[in-house]
UniProtKB/Swiss-Prot annotation:
Pfam families: SSB. One of its GO terms (cellular component) is nucleoid. Residues 1-101 form the SSB domain. One of its GO terms (molecular function) is single-stranded DNA binding. SUPFAM superfamilies: Nucleic acid-binding proteins. The keyword DNA-binding applies. Residues 170-181 have a biased composition (Basic and acidic residues). It comes from Mycoplasmopsis pulmonis (strain UAB CTIP) (Mycoplasma pulmonis). Residues 142-181 are annotated as: Disordered. HAMAP family: SSB. Homotetramer. Keywords: DNA-binding. This is Single-stranded DNA-binding protein. GO terms for biological process: DNA replication.
Amino acid sequence: MNRICIVGRITRDPYNNITNSGISYSRFTIAVDRRNFSSQRSENITDYIPVVAWRGLSEFIKKNVFKGTLVSVEGSLQSYIRSEDKNTSYEVNIENFSILESRQIIEERKSKIQGNHSMNSSFLENNINYNALKEYKNHNTNNIQNQNSYSNEKSQSQTSFLDDEQTSESNEKWDLESDWD
């Protein structure tokens, strides 16, 4: 079974593009810490893992994910040979994707990056779950008109709210266009 699960931060804004056949994709790198048990001290080592998202998930990422965003990714490891140097490279093909911090935190980080300083305040931590497999099944990927009408469709993402260590039992469906613009 080829299954990868990683949690980390986006190292820079995702690169978004469209293939020659009209399929949108996003590529980015996630910084993930792991312990180095070979040294005398238990030090953290940061790995940089390249990932790729396709179709509807790519559109979601393009609008909502920025440098520094804390995310969870599930997918499969795939290899390919780079044409320029004939070396084998690896990346994670995303199947499930979650943003692990609130919109408020993301907006504060964006403001600081742009030179604006906004005040810190308490927040509810939102987990925005986005299942790429469901999105893939619900879209006709060969029809560009369906890609353009994406903004009118309801997302199948669910949000659970966390307050410190207590989990709220309410899950809500979100319309990604209206809630994240």
